[in-house]
Amino acid sequence: MIAPEKLLETARTLEPRLVEWRRTLHRHPEVGFDLPETKALVKKALTEMGYTPQDCGKCGVLALAGGKKPGKTILLRGDMDALPIQEESGEEFASEVPGRMHGCGHDMHTAMMLGAAKLLKEHEDEIEGTIKLEFQPAEEIFQGSLDMLKNGLLEAPKVDAAVMFHVLAGMPLPAGMVLVPGGDRKSVV
């Protein structure tokens, strides 16, 4: 089992890289299944960390951490696609692509997934079971997960449980708070 203190210590060192990934993705938003730059960034980062990323479906990416000790397989999912709307934020890292922007946080989700991948790789020998990382396209058009499911997302290794996350911008919550609703949740996206 990975000690929380070790994870936090490593996580604190990743902040500059997370900001860099997020801002790069934010400047170059891509929509639907048409994510060549985003997918290339994800696969390059994963490869540099020591993963062997695998394509899944039209544009999804998978990577495995752990697997050296017995245990369950947990899927960790993050989405990568942007929205077909014009950004008017004026931020220094605003979209450079007319009519497209990361207005729903998927740039952050992708950066956070890469951060999780880095943490997991650095503590891989401590993982009981396997963590399957899913970088999903086309969430905004409700097609990305369906495509990945049809192309073996939940197999090899078989997934026992899945977790996804989403930022809640504008919510009156303190920084660092995580909300986890009770009970089972299921989704098609």
What are these regions (language model features)?
Residues 2-102, 111-127:
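Acidic/His- and Gly-rich active-site-bordering loop/insert found
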Residues 62, 83-84, 90-101, 108, ...:
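Histidine/acidic-residue-rich, glycine-tolerant segments that coordinate divalent metal ions
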